[in-house]
Amino acid sequence: MGEIEIKQNMNHNENSEKMNQITMLGTGNATVSQIYNTCFVLQTSSTLMLVDAGGGNGILSQLKKVNVQISDIHHLFVTHAHTDHVLGVIWVIRMVAQCKGYEGLLHVYGNDKVMKVIKTIIDMILAKKQLAKVAERVVFHQLEDGDCFEVGDMKLECFDIQSTKEKQFGFRAELPGTSEDNAASDNASEDNLAKPLVLACLGDEPYNEQNRRYIDGVDWMMCEAFCLYADRDTFKPYEKCHSTALDAGKLAEELGVKNLILYHTEEKTLATRKENYTREAAKNFKGRIFVPDDLEVIEL
């Protein structure tokens, strides 16, 4: 297992109140056109990390809508090299290269296939002047299964989701603050009080039992739900190596997580998506369920 330590170049007041949140830039699957492909910003009071970037320059519009500037982005985790996750990364890198006054470095994290795809594309399509800036400003970190690394005040551990379609990494992130388990116990021991707040991102394919240790009992689980189980004959999730809101709810209950975030959905039921996906997941899961819209902020 390798280990990478990267410190966010931002001022941090140790006495400031911690604020952890996710901003969903997109919540849709690969072929959506009314909403954006699934990607999000994970941030604390002092650290910001972009996770995936969707399938095109729509990422620039989504970032602008939530008031995140290119100059704010110094960490980018890419789960896998499918079009709806990696092509927006090319635009982010291009904008970093041509951003006047960009300070510091952009750290891009991903597996070997992700690194190969990104580097191949930028080498083929960016101008020499832009490539020179990429060499100055962008650092590529090739990750292996189980690698641990720090992004500012977040401690991450990545894991291979064992996809049969495309090599893909999810991650477990320890965030500032303490786990909800601590608040639930009035007689918590000192060891338990130190238990961190943990989020797990499972990528965009079904859970594999090999990764239980990364996800079991986490405070927040981010999980794909391609459609409702009730609509499985229409959207064919299982044939596409995806799962449903019902499956996600069962998984969350089985793993003992506290909060469930569903994403990477179809877009034909947007008017009822939040209500119906929540209801279906709640048939088995007793914790809190979030079915966010694009640009929605979830406080962790």
Where are these regions (language model features)?
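Divalent metal-coordination and catalytic microenvironments
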Residues: I22, D52, L63, H80, ...
